[in-house]
Design a protein with these regions (language model features):
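Short alpha-helix in the Rossmann-fold core of NAD(P)-dependent oxidoreductases
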Residues: 53-58, 74-77, 104-105, 165
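Active-site Tyr-X1-5-Lys
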Residues: 98-126
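Flexible, glycine-rich beta-alpha linker
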Residues: 82-83, 123-144
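Substrate-positioning beta->alpha
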Residues: 138-144, 158-181, 187-191
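Short, small-residue-biased leader/transition segments that mark boundaries at the very start
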Residues: 2-7, 203
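Conserved Rossmann-fold NAD(P)-dependent oxidoreductase catalytic core, especially the SDR/UDP-sugar
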Residues: 60-100
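NAD(P)H-binding glycine-rich loop region in Rossmannoid oxidoreductase-like domains
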Residues: 17-56, 60, 64-67, 82
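Mid/C-terminal beta-alpha module of Rossmann-like enzyme folds, strongest
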Residues: 178-245
Length: 247
């Protein structure tokens, strides 16, 4: 079916998870909550925004589930709780987040876990930690990368073999639905990225091939970029992703 048919069968209600959730729709204990709400772009927001939305939002979503006796939650976290590193991470790896976003998502995971533990024999919690999610209409990292290549504004920052853990949005959704149907009570935690992960060069070259782009992408020394980021970042560069953390 086309997307138009899908949209016609949905009901959309504006809801701010930073406040108590009160929605005027029928809710039953058999409903399932998919908690996707988050402030996520890093950098791009004041530190407080990550904590206010991601932590308080988790508290309010879990309170809503508690109020109506909902037994199943699927929560999208992130690989950000692992911190910035390129060594292989498993679900058993100790999280060491080093950004407000990563810290807030790890705390949100724990809030959901506490909700499940209150009635561990009845409640089902699935936590997924996706990498960069891409797909039609995402207007995120991959979309910006494409337009950067097309406009001649993208370059390799210091190296071409930077690992970019990622997953296609429909693959992620299929996996979440599969686990929802094949998971009883308890807590499940999954990293959701392609393995082996792709390098930025592989992603760029694949994108160029798929779209017919003939652009040459050059590599700029990391030391030069770091100097520029330290200067430009405080002057408004963070809004464009130009800061030492991104380099």
């Amino acid at each position: 079916r086309g997307l138009g048919d899908v949209y016609k069968r949905q009901t959309y209600i504006n809801c701010d998870v930073r406040s108590e959730i009160n929605i005027d729709v029928p809710v039953t204990s058999e409903d399932v909550i998919f908690n996707f709400a988050a402030v996520h772009r890093t950098p791009g927001h004041p530190d407080q925004a990550y904590f206010e939305t991601n932590i308080r939002g988790a508290e309010n979503v879990c309170a809503f589930a508690e109020k109506f006796g909902i037994k199943k939650i699927v929560f999208t976290s992130s690989i950000a709780p692992y911190g910035a590193a390129e060594d292989l991470k498993t679900e058993e790896t100790l999280p060491t987040p080093n950004t407000p976003y990563g810290i807030s998502k790890l705390v949100a995971e724990k809030i959901h876990t506490i909700w499940q533990a209150k009635k561990s024999n009845e409640r089902q919690l699935t936590i997924v930690r996706p990498g960069v999610v891409f797909g039609k209409g995402e207007n995120g990292n991959f979309t910006r990368l494409y337009w950067g290549i097309r406009g001649g504004k993208f370059f390799y920052p210091g190296r071409k073999d930077t690992i970019k853990a990622c997953i296609y949005v429909k693959e992620l959704v299929r996996f979440m639905l599969y686990r929802l149907e094949n998971h009883n009570e308890g807590v499940e935690l999954y990293n959701c990225t392609y393995e082996p992960a792709f390098t930025i060069e592989q992603i760029v070259e694949t994108m160029k091939k798929a779209t017919g782009l003939q652009r040459t992408v050059v590599e700029v020394p990391g030391s030069l970029l770091m100097t520029v980021a330290r200067i430009v970042g405080p002057l408004g560069g963070k809004a464009l992703g130009i800061c030492p953390a991104r380099v």
